Amino acid sequence: MPVLALLIAYLVGSIPSAYLVGRANGIDLRTVGSGNLGATNVLRTLGWKPGLFVYVADMLKGFLPVLLLPRFAGVAAGWPWGVAFGMLAIAGHVRPVFLRGKGGGKGVATASGVFLALAPIPFVCATGAFIIVAVVTKYASLGSLVGALVLPIAVVLQERALTPLVLVSGLVSAFVFWTHRENIVRLRQGNERRISLPGQRA
């Protein structure tokens, strides 16, 4: 049963929320904007309401497997199974099987959902940092990177020991930086696109 639950976690993560919203609006988001199937590209291309919808949907792809699959599989929540379900959901989001393993998002929203289930207080800290930086600078990528830095720090302060959750948060943070490597280059060059506030178009 745990093996089946692992597969379910990956399949849930693979649901291409941004792709489906784009298709519902008559476009393939892989061919417009940044080409990324994430909430930021939806925000820039279709506006803040579809962008918010995709962000919440992608976050739930991480939250629900961690919350529900341990009960389904008859295993303990948290470490190691809850974490494994969450990591596979993130992997599915970045490399979705329904799109043949290509064209996924960068994992930020899904990772947020994972840590909402595993560590709510660090989640709030990281999300707060993301929102503040993104609103002030209008760079969603910079907000994601700052949030990724804050997450393991907040987990360390919560755990007060080198627990598996600390290690996982560090790995997730490093993974977010890896998926944003092109954004980092554009930020350094001053070529990164800004997001728009609600009521505006990118």
Predicted segment positions?
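C-terminal ends of transmembrane helices
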Residues: 18, 23, 90-101, 130-137, ...
